[in-house]
Amino acid sequence: GVDSYKKNNCDGVIAFGGGSGLDVGKAIAFMSGQNLPIWDFEDVGDNWTKANSDKIAPIIAVPTTAGTGSETGRASVILNEETGVKNIIFHPKFLPSIVILDPILTVGLPAKMTAATGMDALAHNLEAYCAPGYHPMADGIALEGMRLINKWLLEAVSNGSNIEARMNMLTAASMGSTAFQKGLGAIHSLSHPVNALNNIHHGLSNAIFMPYVLTFNKDVIEKKIIKICDYLELKDRSFDGFVNWVLDLRKKLD
């Protein structure tokens, strides 16, 4: 991708597709002006400061799925095929300059992929809200992202041509990526190695791990989960009620 960028004298990248497509496009824009290997910029410590910031190409992001929210993220997740490890490559300028959210582009997404990417968006919003630390803006964004998913995910899966549902899911996905600047959790910590080793869709593995991680973390997140229940106006506004909501959502999406 970088060779093609240079060969054609490009001056920017339009990253088009799902999370993987967007991440690769962002990585090409980033690496087009770097001399070090991409792995030297893994999101560890201040590695990002090694980059030549002036040589990072501008990025326009056009997502065609509603899951990763990579269009509002400052990183790319790239699989190192030699090690089998999914590495997070970070730089503030990974954040696209322009994002185009067009629900028409997601209408043809199959129901199973709509469900899996939707659960990825839910995991982002949920883990961001439950992450420790004080970030009221991220918390507010995450809560509203979960409300949109609660209202629109099942509709987007069952009626893929519903433009309103598709637009709201795109919005929720972008909100999730924005919110998780606060942090993520064990759902993603468990998912990434499983995805890399077994080629399981990231959203699917998030959905699998979600209720187990919630239960494991009950003692430290219960108060936050009850606030989520209140915001989503669930019938059973308890920790167990929320876990049952997740289980019921998974069952309906299966």
Language-model regions: role of each:
Residues 34-43, 199-201, 219-222:
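Phosphate-handling active-site elements
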Residues 211-254:
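Mobile late-domain/C-terminal helix-loop "cap" segments
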Residues 1-5, 149, 242, 246:
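Generic hydrophobic alpha-helical segments
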Residues 2-3, 7-101:
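Glycine/threonine-rich beta-strand-loop-alpha-helix active-site module
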